[in-house]
Amino acid sequence: MLLSMTPFPTVSTAPVTGVGPRAARSLTAEFARHNEATTALVIGADHSSAVVAAAVEALLPGDTLILVAGERSTAELLRDHITGLGSWIADRVRIVDSLAEAEPADVVVLGEPLTGTAEEARAVLDGLSKYLTDGAVVSVATPATPGRTGGAAAELFRQSALFGVGSDLVVRNQPPLRIHKLRFSRADTAKAATLAPAYRPSSVPVTRSMHIDSNGVAAAGIALGLAALARSARPASKLWLLPALAAAPVAAFFRDPERDTPTDPRAVVAASDGKVLSVERLTDERLGEGEFLRVAVFLSVLDVHVNRVPVAGRVTDYFVIDGGYANAMTAAAEHNVAAYTVLDTDHGTVGVVQRTGLIARRIVQRTPVGTLVARGERMGLIRFGSRTDVYLPADRADATVTVGDRVIGASSVIARWR
């Protein structure tokens, strides 16, 4: 990415082509999910780029978008482009001639993929510090094609391990891109309640209301690949039909439907689809002192496996407890492998625990420590089924479900804050 108008080192992107619409949407997702007045800064903006288009589309009343031209554009071209979009947008977009003229922003987006050496990438990120408000997010892309990333990709992975609040692989881009979202200072937990659920490329749309998790797309692709190989190897045989017919059911296991989340601010929503196994008060020292209200939900192999965030908050911890793989409907499941996601919320500490089962052996969690999450937001999945527990401060919440109730993730209200 050429940052020729910036006070920190230039990083070349000569071998890299542009950012497509999907990658642009991921890069600007943190700006798009804010429902309160927000300032975004796009560095390396091209007047014809998908990144500028996505940032403009995300504008709400009260927002401010600051653009710094990249090597493929100029401030004058940006001004002409924004003016042509109408006064409503032009009034909310500010174009500066150099980065030095920009003010600190809540979301900073590098408009072109970052390449070069690790030292150059580190210098770019260090140079951005003066343009970040408290809790700001930096969104940056690096090519995900082997041999074309240099040291920048390794440095971004290192930075993501320390400060990452999200990472998306966008395969449908040329070249494929890895989007890193970094937060270098703690965010205000209260802001989580004002956010919309984050856009995740891992949720692949099939229709307007039905998505498939990327795990399902990969599994279906493998099945179809096996079918193609079988047909090529034995054209006269019908053996290829077995993996071909299996592709759709395999993808269906990973279905990820869109959900309407209740607007009641006191509502706590189900973290998964399934049947309520237990509603009880207990203690769990892993989550801290005090008593918790726990609602445990069993996911059968036929239920939607994607897990949702039950309440808005900030992820403060994530850890996995080793254990067995007992049937999730039995008491022995208490000692199964369990992944704890701990949230700081306006109502105290909340825990979401994904447990393995007899069949389910794989837990996926996509909300790193430091992430602000909205209620109903996708947070991961369990392959295939098993159990998800929600822990709430017992003195601040009342259950609204009983044992045997069927619940829908992100939609069903399982408890209400007092």
Model-predicted segments: where are they?
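Class I SAM-dependent methyltransferase Rossmann-like catalytic core
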Residues: 2-41
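Conserved SAM-binding loop of SAM-dependent methyltransferases across substrates and taxa
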Residues: 47-62
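S-adenosyl-L-methionine
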Residues: 74-102
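Conserved beta-strand signature within the Rossmann-like core of class I S-adenosyl-L-methionine
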Residues: 132-146
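A short glycine-rich, Lys/Arg-flanked "PGG" loop and its adjoining helix->strand segment in the class I
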Residues: 122-134
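A short SAM/SAH-binding and catalytic strip from SAM-dependent methyltransferases
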Residues: 105-125
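Class I S-adenosyl-L-methionine
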Residues: 148-197
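Contiguous, well-folded functional domains in the mature portion of proteins
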Residues: 182, 197-418
